[in-house]
């Protein structure tokens, strides 16, 4: 089977369930942005993969990557086809919240805004965070056209918090001072 079908050559694509839409459709923009995020998360995971002491973060990120595939599929469901994709479980959101809570407990509280950076892997966390926030905005645009699952909206909202805190935690792991924003 060839990877190309030529069915998208005129700017259309097919959602799960058979609905044909323009590639600029809000749902396509939403799952495309989550797909973009997954590439950045994979890069972040690869940066940490052989770092001593980072195995737990790699495991979390691999789990998040798997969850992202589910989210992409859910966002790609058309008017028909919801029976073809497993929903995102509430447990998935609860697991992510627990990971966020753990990361937050491992870093000192902040009373000021910080500037991203200080280490390439920390910067990668902030790229993931900002692309995640864009994905969330795209999901809400798609939600106006066709309601999107509440679990997806909650999960993507939490995910940007996860990347922010992972960046903070990695700053401490690498011994990098968090840079304070001074207006």
Describe these PLM feature segments:
Residues 1-183:
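Phosphate/pyrophosphate-binding loop motifs in nucleotide- or prenyl diphosphate-using proteins
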């Amino acid at each position: 089977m060839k990877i190309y079908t030529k069915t998208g050559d005129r700017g259309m694509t097919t959602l799960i369930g058979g609905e044909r839409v323009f590639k600029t459709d809000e749902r396509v923009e939403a799952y495309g942005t989550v797909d973009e995020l997954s590439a950045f998360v994979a890069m972040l995971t690869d940066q940490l993969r052989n770092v001593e002491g980072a195995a737990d973060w790699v495991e979390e990120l691999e789990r998040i990557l798997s969850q992202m595939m589910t989210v992409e599929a859910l966002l790609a469901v058309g008017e028909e086809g919801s029976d073809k994709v497993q929903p995102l479980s509430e447990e998935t959101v609860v697991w992510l919240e627990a990971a966020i809570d753990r990361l937050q407990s491992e870093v000192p509280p902040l009373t000021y805004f910080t500037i991203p950076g200080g280490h390439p892997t920390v910067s990668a966390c902030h790229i993931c965070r900002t692309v995640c926030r864009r994905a969330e905005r795209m999901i809400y645009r798609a939600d106006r056209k066709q309601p999107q699952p509440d679990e997806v909206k909650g999960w993507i909202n939490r995910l940007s918090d996860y990347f922010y805190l992972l960046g903070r935690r990695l700053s401490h792991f690498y011994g990098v001072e968090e840079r304070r924003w001074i207006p």
